[in-house]
Amino acid sequence: MRIAFVVLLGAHGLIHLLGASKAFGWADVQQLRTPISALGGTFWLVAAILLVGAATCFALGAQWWWWFGLPGMVLSQVLIAQSWSDAKVGTLANMVIAIPLLLLLLDARPGSFRSRFARDRDALMALPAHPMSLVTETDLTILPPLMQGYLRRVGAIGRPHVRNLRVTFDARMRSSATSPWMQATATQYEFFNPPARLFYMNATRTGMPIDIFHRYVGSAATFQVRIASLFSMVDKSGPVLTRAETVTLMNDIVVMAPAAVLDLPFTWKTIGERALLATFTNAGNMVSATLAFDAAGDLVGFLSSDRTQEDAKGSRNVPWSTPISGYREVDGIRIGALGDANWVEPSGEWTYGQFEIRSIAYNVTR
């Protein structure tokens, strides 16, 4: 779908060169019978540049592609109206181009998930913050040996304690083991004093844009999904969801900001040569998970029975697993950049989410 839109946008822009060619005598354009002045030809050329520029920006994933696309589409339609008998079919292309532009407009309104996400982020960023001291070997003495080794491997020693993080993902999601995958991108902010989590995802299913917003601030979590920023698919809240989101928060901490365990209410119990039982408490919710480490000391597995699976029949406790791999250095920290989200059902384990970290930054101000 993305490629098709880029091709349409780019081709539509290039076609406008016909108007410029006719006006400046670059070519004998028999398809355009309406006379075009030199000034008119300049406008046709500008429309071509704007639309091709928009296609290029869209192909590169630039969010501001509409800076070119919107004026290009408007100018294009004005020119088409002036040469209606020859160019009216171009209106169909402009109608298609108008759809994502309309969705962007809806996304910018105050009640959209994107706007709410930004307001929550700014409010949490505005909370008083104190300078963060550096993590030392002495700090690690409160942890079991497996966690000490893990923090050394990720490179936490000598870096500041973690106040917050910002991470972006490429992702694939599906609703069942047999459902088709939908592509997605996501941005997440995590705060650790006090703990909070904001997760905003854009996905596409059969060409339809879907917005997903997880919000866990204070003692309550919400989970909402909308189609095209307008039509609600999911709107959940309450203690069961908050407990499940506490597990997600715990997972994010040990995977993406392991040094934050030094400043949060975690307890530990060694249950094997390469496994720990970790317990985390937040907002009255105490949740646990088994952390598995490989021979090198990297965290490779997280398994919790305190998370609920939501389906058409309601919610039920199902073991939740997140295998972790693809360790590499990101923003000076060595983390597992690849992760799956799995449900471990009696019939077997299946993956409903696959995530790859594109970027991560710690102690951010924006």
Regions found by a protein language model. Give the residues of each.
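N-terminal leader/targeting segments and the immediate start of mature chains
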Residues: F113-R166
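Short amphipathic beta-strand and strand-loop transition segments with alternating hydrophobic
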Residues: Y189, P265-T270, S325-G326
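Short solvent-exposed loop/turn micro-motifs enriched in small/polar/acidic residues
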Residues: W181-Q183, V261, I271, A283-M286, ...
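N-terminal mature ectodomain segment of secretory-pathway/periplasmic proteins
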Residues: Q148-F231
